[in-house]
């Protein structure tokens, strides 16, 4: 029979051990904020320099631009059904192909689990096996994300999809660096091929959660380590993130607060690819501002042109 003092001692030991583990693990969590530099094992991915294209004919550039084919995967759950309708009619039309997977209602996810990592694995495997030969880049985003596909293609223009690329907005979690799904995740065809092989192995990409549940984007990063691939943070030439995890209004508010003299420069990159946390109405506003509104007499001397798919009925 254990005495009351003995019971209290063991309880204290147990609580102390748990507290030490949690403090140790939480103490290792570091999130890289915009504008804050840290050393990484990999380089930061940046777009090509437009001067590199000046001596290349427009015909060749157009053909090269057509060779970049992006498959968009909209993955997630939304209580607001209008998201799906707006997504179909706005930025996803600029993808070479886009499919929307509602993790709550889609038949593809008729599996014995509500686990987001299992659902993400299912989506990636399904897309690659069905479309892997026809597209060289695969972009996964949440229903609340707005993406500028032309800027994504510009970032990828000089990248070889036969190499394993895993890029977006990187976050550090303990010893793990991963691309957060809130900013969108980009995988090259070669990496999708490797991931597909890994997913056939139930052990290498199994659920890695131990004390608490790990999110699907962290699980993906752990899985991709088996392919020898690490996350890459995408930036412009000013070092600003191009995959944003917040809505543009919030980024502007932060810039006004932090540096009111340079709001435009401090807010966002002019080559931004994603913004997250948008309502369906805000997505419509973004579409108007990006593709409809024109400043009379202002001419953008862009070297490259990325045209939306034929029949997209979208500028």
Curated annotation (Swiss-Prot):
Top-level taxon: Eukaryota
Keywords attached to this entry: Glycoprotein, Membrane, Signal-anchor, Transmembrane, Transmembrane helix
Predominant location: membrane
Topological type in the membrane: Single-pass type II membrane protein
Recorded GO MF terms: glycoprotein-N-acetylgalactosamine 3-beta-galactosyltransferase activity
Residues making up the signal peptide according to the UniProt record: none
Glycosylation (residues): 55, 301
Subcellular location field: Membrane
Gene Ontology cellular component annotations, sorted alphabetically: membrane
Lumenal side: 30-315
Chain ranges passing through the membrane: 9-29
Cytoplasmic side: 1-8
Family the entry assigns: Belongs to the glycosyltransferase 31 family. Beta3-Gal-T subfamily.
Name of the featured protein: C1GALT1-specific chaperone 1-like protein
Organism: Homo sapiens (Human)
């Amino acid at each position: 029979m254990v005495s009351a003092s003995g019971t209290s001692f063991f309880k204290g030991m147990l609580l102390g051990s748990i507290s030490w583990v949690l403090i140790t693990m939480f103490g290792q969590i570091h999130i890289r904020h915009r504008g804050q530099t840290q050393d990484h094992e990999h380089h930061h991915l940046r777009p090509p320099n437009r001067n590199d294209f000046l001596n290349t004919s427009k015909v060749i550039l157009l053909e090269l631009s057509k060779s970049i084919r992006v498959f968009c995967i909209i993955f997630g759950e939304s209580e607001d059904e209008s998201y799906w309708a707006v997504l179909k009619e706005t930025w996803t039309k600029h993808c070479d192909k886009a499919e929307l997977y509602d993790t709550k209602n889609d038949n593809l996810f008729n599996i014995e689990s509500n686990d987001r990592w299992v659902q993400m694995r299912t989506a990636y495997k399904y897309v690659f096996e069905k479309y892997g030969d026809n597209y060289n880049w695969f972009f996964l985003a949440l229903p609340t994300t707005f993406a500028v596909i032309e800027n994504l293609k510009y970032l990828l223009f000089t990248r070889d999809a036969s190499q394993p690329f895993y890029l977006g907005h990187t976050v550090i979690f303990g010893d793990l660096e991963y691309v957060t799904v809130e900013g969108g995740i980009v995988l090259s065809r070669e990496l999708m091929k490797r991931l597909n092989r890994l997913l056939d192995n139930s052990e290498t990409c199994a659920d890695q959660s131990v004390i608490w549940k790990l999110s699907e984007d962290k699980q993906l990063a752990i899985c991709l380590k088996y392919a020898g691939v690490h996350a890459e943070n995408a930036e412009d030439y000013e070092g600003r993130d191009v995959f944003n995890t917040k809505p543009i209004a919030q980024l502007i508010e932060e810039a006004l607060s932090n540096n009111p003299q340079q709001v435009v420069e401090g807010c966002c990159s002019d080559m931004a690819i994603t913004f997250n946390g948008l309502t369906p109405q805000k997505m419509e506003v973004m579409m108007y501002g990006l593709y409809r509104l024109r400043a009379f007499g202002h001419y953008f001397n862009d070297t490259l042109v990325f045209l939306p798919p034929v029949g997209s009925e979208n500028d």
